[in-house]
Curated annotation (Swiss-Prot):
Protein name: Transforming growth factor beta-3 proprotein
Subunit structure: Interacts with ASPN. Latency-associated peptide: Homodimer; disulfide-linked. Latency-associated peptide: Interacts with Transforming growth factor beta-3 (TGF-beta-3) chain; interaction is non-covalent and maintains (TGF-beta-3) in a latent state. Latency-associated peptide: Interacts with LRRC32/GARP; leading to regulate activation of TGF-beta-3 and promote epithelial fusion during palate development. Latency-associated peptide: Interacts (via cell attachment site) with integrins, leading to release of the active TGF-beta-3. Transforming growth factor beta-3: Homodimer; disulfide-linked.
SUPFAM superfamilies: Cystine-knot cytokines
Post-translational modification note: Transforming growth factor beta-3 proprotein: The precursor proprotein is cleaved in the Golgi apparatus to form Transforming growth factor beta-3 (TGF-beta-3) and Latency-associated peptide (LAP) chains, which remain non-covalently linked, rendering TGF-beta-3 inactive. Methylated at Gln-293 by N6AMT1.
Name of the encoding gene: Tgfb3
Cystine pairings recorded for this chain: C307-C316, C315-C378, C344-C409, C348-C411
Entry's Gene Ontology molecular function annotations: cytokine activity; growth factor activity; identical protein binding; protein-containing complex binding; transforming growth factor beta binding; transforming growth factor beta receptor binding; type I transforming growth factor beta receptor binding; type II transforming growth factor beta receptor binding
Length: 412
């Protein structure tokens, strides 16, 4: 009993000491020059490791990047930004070990055809639904290594719409059979019919994986209005034989008039960039020879929104821009020219700033046993991927590198 009382008094004394010395931390604060040097070397190793390269490729002799390659790079970067925003809202993070290695990016535009080829015959053509077909056979041999697939379509305003909002639903088209449904539901969205243009993204990973494994199952995707072929009165009653019209319009599908002058070929390429397309992230087989380095990450805490706007002295994310040419001496990366890698820095005060009871216990235990373990340090918590465009010889490549941008930090 006496021993327990002595331990309790020691803990209380330590708590009081920690309250007085809130800025105490055994993690040494490094100068910026030293931090940047270490961060640059870490990034150099990370990029080469994720690409499974032992040394940087030779700079390409190509000075002009084709428009289609730049369009793929821009689409991928926009998609990753959207995906990160969705994960933040849902407080979810990917945990697959395959997340570590770089992914090859493939873009497949919708197969263009006559108007009736993009519509279904269940309801009057062009009124209630649109069909989108894609040829992904070129990556079938690597189908089992699909990491993620996104269907993207650009909604454009419809000034002549009679309603301000309409619900659309995305389906995978299945082979007709009397025992199964013709469609498989993927997702739905309530959208404005007017307003400004916006990209819509749907996760179609499972659907595309099925297409890659069984080519005959690739019958396309369909966007239709909710409860097609009926119009509803304000009280909810159905008006038979009166069809609700799809008033949501999509770029590259609804035959909008694009009047313009100049080089028609250039205009066509620019319009193709906004047409419906699939973006596939594939893991090359040679990058799956050894296990990745993925892991769980918790919800963001000390992020860029807070740290970049406040003069926080304790643990926070700090801005750090890496220029590929100046800092790494690399000329083989065409896009981007550099990026904000950022880093975590600042002391981790006991009790007040530690975000978990675990960190507090570590601090107290370290005071009791200074030789036994390390105290909490400021480390990355949430990281974002980076998209790069580079050449191997004359072959352009667009790839996604995971966990390259520090977005938030924590004491651990």
């Amino acid at each position: 009993m006496k021993m327990h009382l002595q331990r309790a008094l020691v803990v209380l004394a330590l708590l009081n000491l920690a309250t007085v010395s809130l800025s105490l931390s055994t993690c040494t604060t490094l100068d910026f020059g030293h931090i940047k040097k270490k961060r640059v070397e870490a990034i150099r190793g990370q990029i080469l490791s994720k690409l499974r390269l032992t040394s940087p490729p030779e700079p390409s002799v190509m000075t002009h990047v084709p428009y289609q390659v730049l369009a793929l790079y821009n689409s991928t970067r926009e998609l990753l930004e959207e995906m990160h925003g969705e994960r933040e809202e849902g407080c979810t993070q990917e945990t697959s070990e395959s997340e570590y290695y770089a992914k090859e990016i493939h873009k497949f535009d919708m197969i263009q055809g006559l108007a009736e080829h993009n519509e279904l015959a269940v309801c009057p053509k062009g009124i209630t639904s649109k069909v989108f077909r894609f040829n992904v056979s070129s990556v079938e041999k690597n189908g089992t290594n699909l990491f993620r697939a996104e269907f993207r379509v650009l909604r454009v305003p419809n000034p002549s719409s009679k309603r301000t909002e309409q619900r659309i639903e995305l389906f995978q088209i299945l082979r007709p059979d009397e025992h199964i449904a013709k469609q498989r539901y993927i997702g739905g969205k309530n959208l404005p019919t007017r307003g400004t243009a916006e990209w819509l993204s749907f996760d179609v990973t499972d659907t595309v994986r099925e297409w890659l494994l069984r080519r005959e199952s690739n019958l396309g995707l369909e966007i239709s209005i909710h409860c097609p072929c009926h119009t509803f009165q304000p009280n909810g009653d159905i008006l038979e034989n009166v069809h609700e019209v799809m008033e949501i319009k999509f770029k590259g599908v609804d035959n909008e008039d694009d009047h313009g002058r100049g080089d028609l070929g250039r205009l066509k390429k620019q319009k193709d960039h906004h047409n419906p397309h699939l973006i596939l992230m594939m893991i090359p087989p040679h990058r799956l020879d050894s296990p990745g380095q993925g892991g769980q990450r918790k919800k963001r805490a000390l992020d860029t929104n807070y740290c970049f706007r406040n003069l926080e002295e304790n643990c926070c994310v700090r801005p750090l821009y890496i220029d590929f040419r100046q800092d790494l001496g690399w000329k083989w990366v065409h896009e981007p020219k550099g990026y904000y890698a950022n880093f975590c820095s600042g002391p981790c005060p006991y009790l007040r700033s530690s975000d978990t009871t675990h960190s507090t216990v570590l601090g107290l235990y370290n005071t009791l046993n200074p030789e036994a373990s390390a105290s909490p340090c400021c480390v990355p918590q949430d990281l974002e991927p980076l998209t790069i465009l580079y050449y191997v010889g004359r072959t352009p490549k667009v790839e996604q590198l995971s966990n390259m941008v520090v977005k938030s930090c924590k004491c651990s």
